[in-house]
A protein has these predicted regions:
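Extracellular carbohydrate recognition and processing domains
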Residues: 208-237
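Active-site-adjacent mobile loop/cap segments within catalytic or ligand-binding domains
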Residues: 148, 163, 249-252, 263-271, ...
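A short beta-strand element within beta-rich, extracytoplasmic domains
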Residues: 160-161, 171-195
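Aromatic-Pro/Gly-enriched surface loop or interdomain linker
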Residues: 63, 78-86, 94, 579-700
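Pro/Thr/Ser/Gly-rich low-complexity, intrinsically disordered linker/stalk tracts
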Residues: 473-516, 557, 571-591
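Beta-strand-rich modules
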Residues: 552-572
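Active-site microenvironments of hydrolase-like enzyme catalytic domains
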Residues: 276-281, 294-392, 422-445
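Short beta-strand-plus-loop segments that form exposed binding edges in beta-rich domains
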Residues: 242-257
Length: 701
């Protein structure tokens, strides 16, 4: 019912005291995760192995994927967006952006030698008003970084006084990238946290869909990359990020408050950390040659300015990659209310989550299932640094595991196995300094598990279950009510109400697994012609008829208008609907055509199962990803069930090629009506569109 569960671990909720990154004009998700800061990561990643003198995967390539990449297909397209849609700020020690291009705009000059394909592009930085030096900061001084080199110790940062009223001088910093090709690019800002830093730095991102504004609390997070969103940019230099020294309405600053500015980067890029043998000259070290998002956390942490004491805790990259992640959480949260005794970046992290899959097979091909792990004691203590009881991690791990198993049993397999709820001394659940857990969702080595595991619908359901578990745990911890964000709307359709107006209608989707996931409002996003979707606007005065919701919008002849609808409530917003388009030619033949989008399939690849041979056959049917696929590394080549695992290079049954790793494969974008409409308009026809589900129910109206 959305009520908080009573428990002995309840503590005071301070989430609105010092918000970190706030998107302006966002709905108030007071029953969601607004004001919460969550640290999470997905499994392992490509790393340098000294024993073999090569970059390699930390796990065996099996069933068309590898754990290093497989859990990405939950965390990046589903889990992180769900948490962000609920209002959370999510940080991760692995690169989240599969975009292989990367542009760095900075106040310091960048390296000159080593430019070329696959290497970062230098953008432009400019200032207006009065600025001064703010001390040590970022500089992209090397084409590659090795050993413990820290780019956040190689340059400088800038500062300007906050403008408390219109009579004081305005100051502005602007970062302008030279985008090499149109696409989606994550935007990371950086700055310096000083004693008098403002809690309300005002950033504006100009992108193909318009402008997005953010308020960033610069009292925390200084000296690393701070993600603020992913946006579509056109090729060239039309986009930019702007920081100004105004004080946003509703905020107050001290008399000596300052804003600070350092580098901004666009896109994830390619690996830029070089490794080699200890007795090898550093100039002979090599990078992974792969996109940054495929690499382990160790390398992103170095690129993000993590302290050398974190990076050098272990003497090999394999152990350092997973062993340093808890220390990274401690560094990010150090000095905050959740980790008050440590030095760090002062971000009050509410929880930490490690998303893994397990190894192991069953002789009868039954489900291995889901294991949840927490750690009661760290260095002999059952208390966190802020005095809270570490036993609450058991409640957290239980909530998440329960949501996952219950939802899988109801939606996919009633016999899905619930494994243990372990108290074990795993680094990722022991050292994080905040409530933490490690999830082993399923066995990536077990064919029965992976029949479900390669299905995008399964990954959506599991990710939603993890998000619900986190939400309900934090509700219990802080004693606040919760609501789960709605599911995407269905039965979307458009129809003309005149030559310059269109009726949009849809239905809310009932969530049979969650009573609180009921929409209370809707957001409409619009794209005109070949532009990008805008930020959207909340629809006021929608007409409700039975279970159908509708609204009217205006159009201008000669343009194609594309729409998608998002449902929201006090807990957050849904994923967007499919995209429908309409258009009226300026001088047409007066006839209308209905375009029906009936391509709604998402699926796992084809599989077969016999006593001796089994596996996935992508040549027969590669399946259909949701929007895009990032976990496919190559087709399965070993189908003999009898072959055992020998080592990760010879994993036996299920073994897969790896020649496609790091590539992004097209999936179902649910955005096709405009393509057909463009051709129809060229032929003189007006067009509108509908989802296939409406047509199947003969409900076009």
């Amino acid at each position: 019912d959305g009520k908080s569960i009573k428990n002995k671990f309840r503590t005071k909720d301070l989430r609105n005291t010092h918000p970190f990154v706030t998107k302006m004009d966002e709905e108030d998700f007071s029953k969601g995760l607004a004001g919460r800061n969550i640290a999470l990561w997905q499994s392992h990643g490509r790393y340098f192995e000294e024993k073999t003198d090569r970059w390699e995967w930390q796990r065996a390539p099996m069933f068309q994927t590898v754990e290093d990449m497989y859990t990405q297909s939950y965390v990046l397209p589903f889990l992180i967006p769900m948490l962000e849609n609920a209002g959370a700020y999510v940080m991760t020690p692995r690169e989240r952006d599969p975009q292989t291009n990367e542009v760095i705009s900075d106040n310091d000059p960048a390296f000159e030698d080593g430019r070329g394909e696959g290497v970062r592009i230098e953008g432009r930085y400019s200032e207006t008003g009065t600025w001064s030096d703010a001390g040590i900061g970022f500089a992209d001084a090397r084409a590659t970084y090795s050993l413990l080199e820290n780019p956040f110790q190689m340059g400088t940062a800038r500062q300007a006084e906050c403008r408390k009223n219109h009579r004081e001088k305005a100051a502005e910093a602007r970062w302008t990238p030279e985008i090499p090709e149109r696409g989606e690019y994550s935007v990371y800002i950086s700055y310096k946290s000083l004693p008098h830093s403002t809690p309300c730095a005002h950033y504006t991102v100009r992108h193909l869909g318009g402008e997005s504004e953010f308020i960033v609390n610069q009292k925390m997070g200084g000296g690393t990359w701070i993600y603020i969103g992913t946006f579509e940019f056109d090729k060239g230099s039309e986009g930019c990020v702007i920081l100004d020294n105004s004080v946003p309405k509703g905020y107050n600053v001290t008399r000596d408050a300052v804003i600070t500015a350092d580098a901004v980067r666009f896109g994830g890029g390619m690996g830029k950390i070089a490794r080699g043998l200890k007795d090898q000259p550093v100039n002979e070290y090599t990078t992974s040659g792969m996109p940054s998002f495929t690499e382990g956390a160790l390398y992103w942490m170095q690129w993000a300015g993590a302290d050398s004491t974190i990076l050098s805790k272990y003497d090999n990259d394999y152990t350092s990659d997973y062993g340093n992640r808890g220390a990274w959480v401690g560094w990010m949260s150090g000095g905050s209310r959740t980790n008050p005794k440590a030095e760090g970046l002062n971000i009050p992290i509410d929880l930490s989550f490690a998303f893994h899959t397990d190894a192991g097979t069953t002789p009868n091909d039954s489900i291995i299932g889901t294991l949840s792990i927490y750690t009661l004691l760290c260095d002999g203590s059952d208390k966190f640094a802020n005095g809270e009881d570490r036993l609450q991690q058991r409640m957290y791990a239980d909530f998440v595991q329960t949501e996952i198993v219950n939802d899988i049993r109801k939606e996919f397999n009633p016999e899905w196995s619930r494994r243990g709820l372990w108290d074990r001394s795993y680094s990722e659940s022991r050292t994080a300094t905040v409530p933490a857990m490690l999830l082993e969702l399923l066995s990536h080595q077990n064919f029965a598990d992976m029949k479900f595991g390669l299905d995008p619908s399964f990954r959506f359901t599991v990710s939603r279950a993890v998000y619900k578990g986190m939400l309900k745990y934090l509700s219990a911890r802080y004693g606040c009510e919760y609501a789960v964000q709605p599911l995407p709307v269905n039965s979307f359709a458009t129809s003309f109400t005149g030559s310059k107006s269109v009726r949009l209608r849809w239905k809310a989707t009932v969530d049979s697994l969650e009573a609180t996931a009921v929409p209370t409002g809707y957001i409409l996003q619009t794209r005109i012609d070949d532009g990008a979707f805008d930020n959207g606007r909340v629809l006021d005065g929608c007409k409700v008829s039975g279970n159908e919701i509708s609204t009217k919008v205006s159009i201008v002849p000669g343009h194609i208008y594309s729409y998608r609808v998002t449902a929201f409530n006090k807990g957050g917003k849904s994923f967007p609907s499919e995209t429908l388009s309409v258009g009226v030619p300026e001088s047409g033949n007066g006839k209308n055509v209905l375009v029906v989008n009936n391509f709604t399939r998402v699926s796992a690849p084809a599989w077969f199962d016999t006593n001796e041979y089994a596996g996935f056959d992508a040549s027969l049917d590669a399946g259909v990803p949701y929007v895009k696929e990032i976990n496919f590394i190559g087709p399965q080549y070993q189908f003999r069930r009898s072959l055992p695992w020998l080592d990760d290079d010879n994993p036996g049954f299920g073994a897969a090629w790896t020649n496609e790793a790091g590539k992004v494969f097209a999936g179902n974008t649910f955005d096709y009506c405009g393509i057909h409409g463009k051709a129809l308009m060229a032929a003189g026809y007006a067009f509108h569109s509908s989802s296939g589900g409406v047509l199947r129910r003969q409900d076009l109206g």
